[in-house]
Amino acid sequence: MTQTARVKLTSTSLPKLDGVCGEIMGIGKKTGVKVKGPTPLPVKRLHVATRKSPCGNGTETYEKWEMKMHRRIININADDKAIRQLMRLKIPDDVYIELSLT
């Protein structure tokens, strides 16, 4: 019986995220299972504005910092062999993966 595995990927580095997506798609092609995705989700943007002057005097000038969180979803009709290969996948430190079976 095949199960559907939903893989959620999150990263601040878009090239590393796309690399992991490509590896997962390659596993799907090798094992011959049906793969849907990668579906891009909206980018989360975290903004932080800080005053440049540490003492509080002078003109109000601000530095603006932004961090983008890129997300992807891949659905795989996975059998045991495909799931084992997903578990062995080498994932970079700044790519977070969440795997749920339904």
Curated annotation (Swiss-Prot):
Gene Ontology molecular function, alphabetical: structural constituent of ribosome; tRNA binding
Gene Ontology BP terms: translation
Origin superkingdom: Archaea
Protein name: Small ribosomal subunit protein uS10
Protein's organism: Nitrosopumilus maritimus (strain SCM1)
Protein role: Involved in the binding of tRNA to the ribosomes.
Entry keyword Ribonucleoprotein: yes
Alphabetical keyword list: Ribonucleoprotein, Ribosomal protein
Family: Belongs to the universal ribosomal protein uS10 family.
GO cellular component: cytosolic small ribosomal subunit
Database matches in InterPro entries: Ribosomal_uS10 (IPR001848), Ribosomal_uS10_dom (IPR027486), Ribosomal_uS10_dom_sf (IPR036838), Ribosomal_uS10_euk/arc (IPR005729)
Subunit-structure text: Part of the 30S ribosomal subunit.
HAMAP family assigned: Ribosomal_uS10
Keyword 4Fe-4S found: no
Record-linked SUPFAM superfamilies: Ribosomal protein S10
